[in-house]
Amino acid sequence: YRSGTCWCFSALSFVESEILRTKGVEVDLSEMFVVGKSYRDRAIKYVRLDGHLNFAAGSSFGDVLHVIDDYGIVPQNFTEGYGFNYGTELPEHNELDAALKGYVSAIVKNPNRTLSTAWINGFDNIVEAYFGEIPATFTVDGVEYTPESYRDFLGINYDDYVNITSFTHHPFYEPFVIEVCDNWRWDTAYNLPMDEMMEVMYNAIDKGYTIAWGSDVSEKGFTRDGLAVMPVEKKQAAAGSDQERWVGKAADAPKEEVKAELPEEMVI
């Protein structure tokens, strides 16, 4: 909706598919649990780096697995209303994102010349005010779990998965950190030639595995129409929430720019 959290919804659906494949269990996991923990980790890293890090709503696939690995996971039905403690039924994070960025930016200025022991608690309290509280324990099919023990029951293991990519500014057949702002955790991806990357993906799908695909939805040629347009005319990347980048602001019609006839370099 009006948030920059598409990365969490898409990556968590991949995790749910993997659980169905490996355990035969259908689960609906809490996206906002992951988002809340991600905010916290991001704030700590932002402060450690004196503000020299992207602090925004966007993130990447690996963030979801990192959060599950570090904090566990909670079913959606035990967090109904969590993440929406501010009067809307869908994520609307513009105010929250601005408040959190303002808070960590003030902390980075270090007015006391040393960090207090209270700053992270203050950050947590802002997130809790907007999101609500997470249950410490919950019961599924008669068994009581914590977020960590539920993760272990589901068998989600970060080390079971690998990122692959295809860029020409790094050597092939080696891992590297993809230099984009949303990769704030500095996860590495194994670099393959484009045709080999596609071959790996098709092979995985043919064998019954799920693929999580990461793309930049802020690019002007990105649409829901099942194609990618690379116009000769260069335009500025779209700003705003994921929803606005996909289909325009809620009050607007879908973006007419991508429907306009322009000279094209390539249509895929």
What do the PLM-derived regions correspond to, one by one?
Residues Y1-I268:
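Catalytic-core signature of thiol
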